[in-house]
From Swiss-Prot:
Coiled coil: none annotated. It is found in: Cytoplasm. Homodimer. Keywords: Cytoplasm, Isomerase, Porphyrin biosynthesis, Pyridoxal phosphate. This is Glutamate-1-semialdehyde 2,1-aminomutase. The modification N6-(pyridoxal phosphate)lysine is found at K266. GO terms for molecular function: glutamate-1-semialdehyde 2,1-aminomutase activity; pyridoxal phosphate binding; transaminase activity. Its main location: cytoplasm. The lineage of its organism: Bacteria, Thermotogati, Deinococcota, Deinococci, Thermales.
Length: 424
């Protein structure tokens, strides 16, 4: 599939934008080649500047659970647009969307809207520290919570090693306030809680990991997380990716979690920039203007994003069968991928929860970040480009989830599997 216009755009973009992209994974650094410059989306498909059509499994990295350009979402945004772009003032739409969030997450009393998942997690951690008066946070390897300084850290050797920066520009002294543990290692978590629990403000975690590829929590790991409450540690469920995707109440509903705070994004904005952090009243009342924890934003709660999010959540709430449909379609795709890869004699593990799926090119099981890193990235490049050249747009990294939407059909799954047979 030829993309000369995209190639020209990419070369021009690199003269004006770092790496030619506004987010690193879009540059295809992990897979090589030229990213298609997309100009249109409809349903489960996107089109590039060269006129090529692709079946989309990126779906803007998760927000588009209804598919591209859903007519009801577009209509709500157009209606709102006619009244103005943004006011920097309270609006009825943010009240309506907050009420939807509370219906989806019954433990939530108060919701604060922001503009990105990074803002949501950063603000939730500041709130946790302000509420508890404690300095340390715990995160897990392979869990991504945005690009705030305190979260761009990785583990050293041993469960109690203080975090060290994984990005230039993050002071080591600041990174040391983050303790980084292995995901799905309940005993390691229990050890840290036993020795340092009273210093820890919060544990932030992805209930289902999406940014190391899909990783699924074990029951004992979830149990160990909830044991942290006995030490006065707040649990922050980062549902920026899983919120409203795995169920209307996200992974919290699906897995029966009991967090103190939840962070939301992606689907919450219906395709426009919106995110939120939310939780129990006694914690959220520490946020300004009610309390001493400061957080603000010029475009927070802006009408266009609130309108898109509200229309999306209304459709999800009114059509609970969407989640059963996505589970069935996801199961078909999972089974088909396993069948094709087995036919080809390739090492593989397919991890899936609902409409999130990852193919790892390694023998399973893949339950930790260390397991995920065993994947054969060269084989993934063949997989990715073989699909892309046949009109299937899979995420350009082996450590990202692929997403289904309600716009995908059974014939799209069959088209994907046939393309994979030819590609490999």
């Amino acid at each position: 599939m030829e993309r000369p216009i995209s190639e020209a755009y990419f070369q021009e973009a690199k003269r004006h934008i770092p790496g030619g992209v506004s987010s690193p994974v879009r540059a295809f650094k992990a897979v090589g080649g030229t990213p298609p410059f997309l100009v249109r989306g409809e349903g489960a498909y996107v089109w590039d500047a060269d006129g090529n059509r692709y079946l989309d499994y990126v779906m803007s990295w998760g927000p588009l659970i209804l598919g591209h350009a859903h007519p009801k979402v577009l209509a709500r945004v157009r209606e709102t647009l006619e009244r103005g772009l943004t006011f920097g003032a309270p609006s009825p739409l943010e009240v309506a969307l907050a009420k939807k969030v509370k219906r989806a997450y019954p433990f939530v009393d108060l919701v604060r809207f922001v503009n990105s998942g990074t803002e949501a997690t950063m603000s939730a951690l500041r709130l946790a520290r302000g509420y508890t008066g404690r300095p340390y946070i715990v995160k897990f390897r392979g869990n991504y919570h945005g690009h705030a300084d305190g979260l761009l850290v990785e583990a050293g050797s041993g469960a109690l090693t203080l975090g060290v920066p994984s990005s230039a520009g993050v002071p080591e002294e600041y990174a040391k306030l983050t303790l980084v543990l292995e995901y799905n290692d309940p005993e390691g978590l229990r050890e840290v809680l036993k020795r340092r629990g009273e210093e820890i403000a919060a544990i932030i975690f992805e209930p289902v990991v999406g940014n190391a590829g899909v990783l699924v929590p074990t029951e004992d790991f979830l149990k160990a997380l909830h044991e942290a409450k006995a030490y006065g540690v707040l649990l922050i469920a980062d549902e920026v990716m899983t919120g409203f995707r795995l169920a209307f109440g996200g992974a919290t509903e699906l897995l029966g979690l009991k967090p103190d705070l939840v962070t939301l994004g992606k689907i919450l904005g219906g395709g426009l920039p919106a995110a939120a952090y939310a939780g129990r009243r006694e914690i959220m009342e520490k946020v300004a203007p009610l309390g001493p924890v400061y957080q603000a934003g010029t475009l927070s709660g802006n009408p266009l994003a609130m309108a898109a999010g509200l229309a999306t959540l209304e459709l999800l709430e009114e059509n609970p069968g969407y989640y059963a449909y996505l589970e069935d379609l996801g199961a078909r795709l999972e089974a088909g991928l396993k069948e094709v890869l087995k036919e080809k004699g390739l090492p593989h593990t397919v991890n899936r929860v609902g409409s999130m799926i990852t193919v790892f090119f390694t023998e399973g099981p893949v339950v930790t970040f260390q397991d995920a890193r065993r994947t054969d990235t060269e084989l993934f490049k063949r997989f990715f480009h073989g699909l892309l050249d046949r009109g299937i747009y899979w995420p350009p990294s082996n450590f990202e989830a692929a997403f289904l939407s309600v716009a995908h059909r059974e014939e799209d799954v069959e088209k994907t599997l046939e393309a994979l047979r030819k590609a490999l």
